[in-house]
Amino acid sequence: PGSKENNGCPELSGEIVKSLNEFGSRINFPANSYQILGRKTIENLEKIKNLLEENQEGNLIIEGYASSDGDEDYNVELSIKRAQAVLEYLVKLGVPETRLEVIGFGEENPLEDNETSLGRAINRRVQFKSKR
């Protein structure tokens, strides 16, 4: 059994979440898009699926993010759609939907400066957390 904070459900270890984010950091999106595109993105989603299969204990939060292009409400909606697209792809690969949850943060918590095109590209991403 897992912790009280996690309603008795087991959590994914910090090491597993770190590995998930290493793959997830390579899941980026074009501006105004939530489509899963590119061979590398698909390979990384398959690696994430394999990691979850190897570690049946614990659930995952998929966090969606956007760059500062567009207004705040639009960016929150877009970030949710990005996280949802990743959820749907993982489910298609065989991950049970009950192990996944989606949150959209819009342009909050940028990894890079939104003043540069490279920074905005990096900020259009998903990240993962163990569900507590």
Identify the function of each model-found stretch.
Residues R39, E63-R132:
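Periplasmic OmpA-like peptidoglycan-binding domain that tethers envelope proteins to the cell wall
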Residues P1-N59:
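Periplasmic peptidoglycan-binding/tethering modules of Gram-negative envelope proteins
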